[in-house]
Each structure stands twice: as C-alpha cells, then as structure tokens.
Amino acid sequence: MAQVAMSTLPVEDEESSESRMVVTFLMSALESMCKELAKSKAEVACIAVYETDVFVVGTERGRAFVNTRKDFQKDFVKYCVEEEEKAAEMHKMKSTTQANRMSVDAVEIETLRKTVEDYFCFCYGKALGKSTVVPVPYEKMLRDQSAVVVQGLPEGVAFKHPENYDLATLKWILENKAGISFIIKRPFLEPKKHVGGRVMVTDADRSILSPGGSCGPIKVKTEPTEDSGISLEMAAVTVKEESEDPDYYQYNIQAGPSETDDVDEKQPLSKPLQGSHHSSEGNEGTEMEVPAEDSTQHVPSETSEDPEVEVTIEDDDYSPPSKRPKANELPQPPVPEPANAGKRKVREFNFEKWNARITDLRKQVEELFERKYAQAIKAKGPVTIPYPLFQSHVEDLYVEGLPEGIPFRRPSTYGIPRLERILLAKERIRFVIKKHELLNSTREDLQLDKPASGVKEEWYARITKLRKMVDQLFCKKFAEALGSTEAKAVPYQKFEAHPNDLYVEGLPENIPFRSPSWYGIPRLEKIIQVGNRIKFVIKRPELLTHSTTEVTQPRTNTPVKEDWNVRITKLRKQVEEIFNLKFAQALGLTEAVKVPYPVFESNPEFLYVEGLPEGIPFRSPTWFGIPRLERIVRGSNKIKFVVKKPELVISYLPPGMASKINTKALQSPKRPRSPGSNSKVPEIEVTVEGPNNNNPQTSAVRTPTQTNGSNVPFKPRGREFSFEAWNAKITDLKQKVENLFNEKCGEALGLKQAVKVPFALFESFPEDFYVEGLPEGVPFRRPSTFGIPRLEKILRNKAKIKFIIKKPEMFETAIKESTSSKSPPRKINSSPNVNTTASGVEDLNIIQVTIPDDDNERLSKVEKARQLREQVNDLFSRKFGEAIGMGFPVKVPYRKITINPGCVVVDGMPPGVSFKAPSYLEISSMRRILDSAEFIKFTVIRPFPGLVINNQLVDQSESEGPVIQESAEPSQLEVPATEEIKETDGSSQIKQEPDPTW
C-alpha cells in the first residue's frame, strides 16, 4: 500500500469516509500500475496530497528517493496550498470583473435560455405523445401546478420560464437534463379562459383512454406559438396517475460536457436503450444525432471515422424513414384528420429553408477550421484538415477554444445549434500541433480523407478497381519469379515473416510491399506506373511450399469452396471424437466414451479440461463455430481431461465400461488444482457461466435422466433442463409474435383483419417496406428465428410497433402471387390437422395460407442467414488474426473494438456498411462484405488490454477479466438451430442472446 504521512494542512471540513475510501482505493490502483511499470524496468515516484494526507506512491526506488527528500513533500504541500489560495483570489477577481463580460455573457445566457426552452418544449411534446416540439403553457402550468408535473429538475430548482433562470441555473439544468420529464396528470382547469385576450378555436375533439384505466377520456390543449394565430390543437394524451414503468417517460438524453465517456459511464449496458437516437452529447437539448449508416447498433463515439448526421429535433419530419427516430414515439390510435390540418402545417419547419441554413453554417465552420489550421501549420492557400489524425493522436493534435461539450469533428457531423455556438466562439478557436511529423508522414494518404458524400460510391469503385489491378500485377510477377506463366496468389504473410529471403524490388520509394488492401489510391497508382520494374526475389523457395495452398483458399469465392454446413458438421464431429477419446484416456479406457458435458459444467473443481486454446471454454462442440473448432483441432495434442472424482461420471458410462475403471488409480496421482497450471503454454482460465462451485449437487448429477447432454446446459443447482417446458414456452411466444406482426400488417393496410406478413418482400425492399418501434437491437425477421428474450421484448413493445408500407400495390401483388402459387396444395390437405390449424387462428381472423413446405422454406432461409453470418465471422477472424501477427484465425473482440474507438481500424468495408458483429448485420450487408473480402483489412493502431499480438499478451494483469466477457460475444456463441438463448427461470437454462449494446 502507498505510504501515508500526515501534514500540517489546515482542514476546515472533514471529508466523508466514503470519499476517503475512494481516494484510498484509487491510490492502491495507482500503486498497482507502478508495480507493472517496474516489471518493465521503469522507475516512478509520485506524491499525492488529499486534505491532511500525503501519499507517496511509486516503485521501490521511487518511494525510497521521495522518502529521503522530505523537502520535496513539504514544497509540494506548500505549492498546493498556494494554488488553492490563488484559485480563491481568481474567483474573487472574476466576480469583480463580471460587469466587463456582460456582453459575452448576454450572448451565452440567451443561447442557454433558448436551449432550455426548446428542451422543455421537446419534453412537453413527448408527454403529449407527439414527436415534434410543442410550446409549453408556462402560465397555465404555474397557475394549475397539479395538472402537469415536471420531474427530474435539479434539487432546489423550481419549474418556471427559462427567462427567469440565471446563468448558473441554466447550466445546472442542462447538465441534469437526462432525467427531466413532463407527466400530464389531468387537463388544465378552466380550459375556456385564456390569458392574453385572444379567443382560440379548438380542433376536432380527440381523446384516448388511459392504458391503466385510471381515468376516462380526457382532452388536453396545447398552447400556440407566440407569433402565430393558429388555433389550439387537441392532442391524444396517455395519462398515468403513477409512473408504473420508470423508463416510460425517460428518453436517454445524455448530459455533461464529456463527449467520449458519458455514454459508456452513464448508460448501463444491460438497459434497453429507448429513444437512443435522441442522445445529445453536449449541453444542447434541441439536437439529436442519427447515425448515417446503420441504426441497429448505436454506440456513440467521438473518435469514430464514420460521420454522423446530426439534425435538430424539429426536423424529424424531414428525415428519411431509415434515419427517422423510431423508438421514441408513443402509441397513438388512428384518428380522423382535423378540419384545420392545413393550417397546422404552417407551424412546421420548411425543409429547404433548414437545409440551406445548415449547409451555409457548415460551410462557414469548415472555412473557419481550414483558416485556423492553415495558421497553425503556417501555410498559405487552401488546406485539407486530416480529421482522422486529430482523432487518433488527441495528445499531439487537438483544438482549443471550442465551446464546452463540443468535440472537434467534421462540420458535416454538427447540427445547427453546435454550428452557431462554434461561430460565436470563433475568435477563441486555435489548432495546437505538437508533432508536425505526424502530418508530413501521412500527407499522401490523407488526400482520400475528405470525400464528398456524393462521390463515395465513385471512390469505392475506383479504389476497388486499382486494388484488383495491383493484385493481378503482383500475382503475375510472383508467378514469373517461380518460373510459371500462370498467375499465382501471393503469400503476403510469408513475405512479411521472411523479409531477407523473400522480398520485392522495384517498388516506388517509401512504399513497402504489402497486400493491395493496405494501399490507398495514390500508392496504388504509383505501383501501377512502375509495374514493369517490379521484381519478386525468392532466395529460399522452400518457404513457399506450404503457403500457396493456405493463401489461395481464403481468396477464392468460387463454387469450389467447401459447403459451410458440411464443413462445420465435419469439424464438430472431429472435435467430438477428440473429446471422447481424451475422456476415455483420462478414465484409463481404450475405447472412446461419450463425454457427459453437464457433469463437467456442474463440477468444475473435480472435472475439468486442460490445454484448450486460449480463450476457449470447455463446452459441447455444437456450441462452437468454425474458427474455434479449427483451433481446438490444431491444439488437440495439448488437450487433457482431469477426473478427480470418477464416481461423478460412472453413472453416465455404458454398463460394461463402469466396471473397468480403477478409481484408486485415478485418484492417487497428485494433479494440479487449477486447470492449466502445469501447461507449458500460458493459458487464460475461463470460467463457464452458471456453475455453483461451492455446493455441487452431486446427487442430481447421478440421476439417470441424461439425454444427449452435449446440447443442453446443466443447471448448477441440480435441477435438470426441461425441454418440453422450454419448447412449449418458445412455441407460444413465437405464435404470439407472429400474430402480432400479422395484426400490425393488417393495420398498415387499413384493414381490421390480420394479414400474413410476406417477410421476403420486407427483406428485398427495405426502403419501401419496414417496421418501426421494434426494441433496440432487435431486427425485423421471422419470429421463428428469435429466441425467448427477444420474443418477450417484442411483446412488451407491441404498442410501439408499426408497419410502414409505401407501395401497397406491390404488397397486394406479392400476397396474390403467394396465395395463387400455394393455394392448390391447400385443397389436398383436408386432414384433421388442417382443421385444427384453422380453429387455432379463427379468433384472430387471420388470412392464412397452409403451405406444406413452408417450414422447409423458412428453415432454409434461416440456415442461409446462419451460413452467411458464419462466413462473415470466419472472414473477420482470419483478417484479425493477420492483423495481430497470427497465422490462424483469431476470435474478433467486437465489444472491445467498439468501446475502444481508434484502437483497431477496419478498412475496405463496402459503402454504407459499418463494422459490427455479424449477428447485427443484414443479409444484404453480409453478402456485400463477402464480395469485398479481399480488401477488408484490420489495422491495430494501439493495443487494448487483453489483446494478444505475436503470441504475446499486451497486459497480463487485465487479460483474465476481458477474456471471460469475450467468451459470450455473439460472434462465437453459435447455436445449432436459431439464435436460441439462455433463459433463466426456475427450471431451465437456455443460451443467452447477445446484449444489443455489444
């Protein structure tokens, strides 16, 4: 522990014990870091002062040095006291010079008041069930305070018009705006009396019953804007006497000045994100950010390369359907259009006006940034700002003077409020460049950094063509070096591993030899220009003997490639045979014995497996995908089963085998207590979720009701998994979700009866047919492809689900075609089973067509999607393995790459497709990724804890924890049938579905 000395600092207020514990804990963590630095032969000395305590932390030599120099400690304490006094004096000086800054503060306070007012209007609109801002009737709310309740205001702040708040209160409200919500309890009293002398005419009456049944139909009027004479409009209001759901009125709006940390620190990963598109990162309540490429996985990151489209909240009605916020709309029943609907449109913003405004502001900010950047590098004329470099080198390249809460990014990612605030602070903005060499070394690659959105497709087509040309050139030159006239695939890894024996001559200056996917357009063009000079030099041809086949296999996307299903089935069977043989050897038997996997999971202290590849837990082979199965097969020689208590597994062996086991012989050797302790290769211990290691219920383990336990996880508390109960539950949920989808589809067509959803049409035309209101992280697919958690999420969110059908004629044609093509078999099926099916759906009045091969067709599509996910995961694993210097595929830590932006960069992805786990990709996106497989490349910019590079763990102290978390990533938890999940109720345990925030 750090050494603590007592100083003579004056103490006015004693710190609470909790704060002191926090400081002590952090100091111990600092000391642990110093120990790790000492292992690298680095010396550290640190002095920390907290109230009356002086902490001396560092390595052994560092602490010894500081302890011998007491004058250092005294000087540091004295310096801290003086700085506190200076800070107090500065505070006084600021208060005295407040009058001199009134002009600056007037602009700032006006902006903050407008922001708070807009945010109050936004919250009030949500309470009324509208997706647009609604003016807040402040006078009525203050006069009748029990009608509308405002929750979440900071302690000590009363609700009133923002004009009555001072600067500090406005900032305080914006910092705590995440919890602010309006709750409408009842209509305002005396609705016919209005302040201001105007006589208002109301719209057509509309009402809605409370979902909780707490009160009857009510009418709530909204205040008009001050500058318009539009009549008041009635809004459908959902009234709740008490908030039954704490998240009902919460809309996940981030607060605080920090842009990169708030999302991860303040938003729990396990909580479903409602209205995540309204996440505001700074102190602006009126703007929201919508990802430009994909909305299925929303992890905001300021260092992300992909720009976000940020619009103000009033512009929701102008956003395209794919980028319109879907999870924030409260349910509203269809109501007749009011008579004055035409007048109401006057209150909405004009898109052309908004577009012209934001385009002009972005252009001004872009010119401002370029001018300031040119001043920093002392350049004349137009310059291009390397935005990715500023994001990846935040310590050496950054911008000062930006308004609080606004990060430095491309102007195209800002909304109108932030652009205006940046222009107000333009005099204070300054570019700081500490290392000019960072700009010079990559200047030629940065010419591609600023493509206009309109030319992105053209750029992608161009770079794809150039990379293919360079790849063909390299293959041709490589074949010439081998004395062949037919082009051969180049083993780039071998050339990187043996630079002295395998290298290339004639490349342009400062361009190393790598795979074409590493090059940008300028370098590719230079290589093509000197193509005649390029020559492959092979001094040791024997190094290439085993590489050609290895390299050509992943590069071929032809029908010669082995079928995925055959491949994974073969690998699983092979691993199953390895496990059975190793288990028999551990029991002293010569014949292979089937492994009772549930017994191993429930007794990890007495039954475990050593020698498994790093990061792979022991499970049934049916749980693994192709990358893990291949790693297990490669490392099969190291695998060893340890059976400390043979009596636990005897009841699961065939009758003839149990008598051959010598229990004493198995128990006599002294085996290590922990798996992997005697392994020569450092293994990371991975604990399988669920088992209770303290009280293993061995009595339940011995029960003879053991089926094919390879697929069924064993309950740690001794209760067995009931397949019948699980199957009944998931079948019922799937039927309910399917009925829900059919009902919503009928509503979208204006019908009172349900209509069977043509899922193929929704998959083929996602722009014309899509679904809004699904839970965060749940894509629209057939209910048969979901597991229990997602099915339950969909049913909980059923009120918000809405089908959007833009082309009803195409929809009706598809329904007619499917009905006409599948109706003849229906006449043949006149068995009692058909009658049962019809009676089961009679109450719902569903238009249903009985299809004999519907299940086969559905399963084939599910299997096809699984194959695509497996192939994409295999591709990512192989590319990631290449990036970290491994010669084999390595599981991609998707979650770590997401929460550590800038550490790993993925290049070569198709336009409009962002990098994420395959389970979150659409089928069309996965196909495009496989088509661009040659150009996808992982680049490790800076390692994160737990990353293995060239067989060396980056941070041994942190490796164990992350690996345990990574074992549950969606890309590696393969489920044989669908995305089945782990359900934790009293009697069953099913594999868990990946968290949507991963």
Curated annotation (Swiss-Prot):
The modification Phosphoserine is found at S19, S103, S207, S210, S214, S412, S517, S668, S674, S722, S784, S823. One of its GO terms (molecular function) is DNA-binding transcription factor activity, RNA polymerase II-specific. SUPFAM superfamilies: GTF2I-like repeat. There is a cross-link at K221, K991 (Glycyl lysine isopeptide (Lys-Gly) (interchain with G-Cter in SUMO1)). The modification Phosphotyrosine is found at Y248, Y398, Y503. Coiled coil: none annotated. Signal peptide: none annotated. Keywords: Acetylation, Cytoplasm, DNA-binding, Isopeptide bond, Nucleus, Phosphoprotein, Repeat, Transcription, Transcription regulation, Ubl conjugation, Williams-Beuren syndrome. Residues 303-318 have a biased composition (Acidic residues). One of its GO terms (cellular component) is nucleoplasm. There is a cross-link at residues 35, 86, 92, 94, 130, 140, 185, 219, 221, 326, 343, 353, 380, 435, 450, 456, 488, 494, 526, 561, 660, 664, 670, 680, 715, 816, 827, 861, 864, 879, 891, 991 (Glycyl lysine isopeptide (Lys-Gly) (interchain with G-Cter in SUMO2)). Ubiquitous. Isoform 1 is strongly expressed in fetal brain, weakly in adult brain, muscle, and lymphoblasts and is almost undetectable in other adult tissues, while the other isoforms are equally expressed in all adult tissues. PROSITE patterns: GTF2I (PS51139). Changing Y398F: Abolishes BTK-mediated transcriptional activation. Abolishes BTK-mediated phosphorylation and impairs BTK-mediated transcriptional activation. The modification Phosphothreonine is found at T556, T558. A motif (Nuclear localization signal) lies at residues 320-327. Homodimer (Potential). Interacts with SRF and PHOX1. Binds a pyrimidine-rich initiator (Inr) and a recognition site (E-box) for upstream stimulatory factor 1 (USF1). Associates with the PH domain of Bruton's tyrosine kinase (BTK). May be a component of a BHC histone deacetylase complex that contains HDAC1, HDAC2, HMG20B/BRAF35, KDM1A, RCOR1/CoREST, PHF21A/BHC80, ZMYM2, ZNF217, ZMYM3, GSE1 and GTF2I. Interacts with BTK and ARID3A. Interacts with isoform beta of PRKG1. Interacts with GPR50 (C-TERMINAL DOMAIN). It is linked to GTF2I is located in the Williams-Beuren syndrome (WBS) critical region. WBS results from a hemizygous deletion of several genes on chromosome 7q11.23, thought to arise as a consequence of unequal crossing over between highly homologous low-copy repeat sequences flanking the deleted region. Haploinsufficiency of GTF2I may be the cause of certain cardiovascular and musculo-skeletal abnormalities observed in the disease. Interacts with the basal transcription machinery by coordinating the formation of a multiprotein complex at the C-FOS promoter, and linking specific signal responsive activator complexes. Promotes the formation of stable high-order complexes of SRF and PHOX1 and interacts cooperatively with PHOX1 to promote serum-inducible transcription of a reporter gene deriven by the C-FOS serum response element (SRE). Acts as a coregulator for USF1 by binding independently two promoter elements, a pyrimidine-rich initiator (Inr) and an upstream E-box. Belongs to the TFII-I family. This is General transcription factor II-I. It comes from Homo sapiens. The lineage of its organism: Eukaryota, Metazoa, Chordata, Craniata, Vertebrata.
